Amino acid sequence: MKKEKAIVVFSGGQDSTTCLFWALKQFDEVEAVTFDYGQRHRLEIEVAASIAKELGVPHTVLDMSLLNQLAPNALTRSDIAIEQNEGQLPSTFVDGRNLLFLSFAAVLAKQKGARHLVTGVCETDFSGYPDCRDIFIKSLNVTLNLAMDYQFVIHTPLMWLTKAKTWKLADELGAFDFVRTKTLTCYNGIIADGCGECPACVLRRRGLEEYMKEKEGANQL
């Protein structure tokens, strides 16, 4: 894969930044694409641009504001509480988001002569999001290939990793400190370790604590 080109779907969060570092190890040419869909915290786009610049990765921001008109949600509307009720999808779920993001990323990739798409979706800690499932990604890969008569390959390096394993991967890629201090995962728009209270921060912190405990245990052997 080294001599080929990849497009990373990039939000500037822990998962997509880890995937960006992964892609930089796997491919000769890497570009990032970020989608502006009216995020509640505009800082997300700024963080993504800053990280891409620091890593020397060409970065494209695409306007997807239509998505917010179609599917209002807690990530774009301050009047919608961030919550998850039993038996229901979290209020942070955006209908069609990964479907649209990967479809537009594929169009961009084809224009740029790239056939590899990289996304940080994960089924292990996926919070019930249906568009983070492996079966969806595989299905979409086939659909995109048929729709554009092109041989895309969608890579999901985190698909079967817990959050602790995602921290481990970042460490193995030499990106642990970078990911911990420079990424934005928090739903309340706080960089690095975040607010510590929203679902994204709780998941991130729990994974970090689990990984650090495992690492300390291994070092004591």
Curated annotation (Swiss-Prot):
- Which biological pathway? Purine metabolism; 7-cyano-7-deazaguanine biosynthesis
Question: Which InterPro entries does this entry report, sorted A to Z?
Answer: QueC (IPR018317), Rossmann-like_a/b/a_fold (IPR014729)
Q: Name any cofactors this protein relies on.
A: Zn(2+)
According to its UniProt record, the EC number is 6.3.4.20
The protein's superkingdom reads: Bacteria
Q: Where does ATP bind?
A: 10-20
For the protein in the UniProt heading, the enzyme class is: ligase
Task: Enumerate the catalysed reactions.
Answer: 7-carboxy-7-deazaguanine + NH4(+) + ATP = 7-cyano-7-deazaguanine + ADP + phosphate + H2O + H(+)
Q: What is the official name of this protein in its record?
A: 7-cyano-7-deazaguanine synthase
Native species: Geobacillus sp. (strain WCH70)
Taxonomic classification, please? Bacteria, Bacillati, Bacillota, Bacilli, Bacillales
Gene that encodes the chain: queC
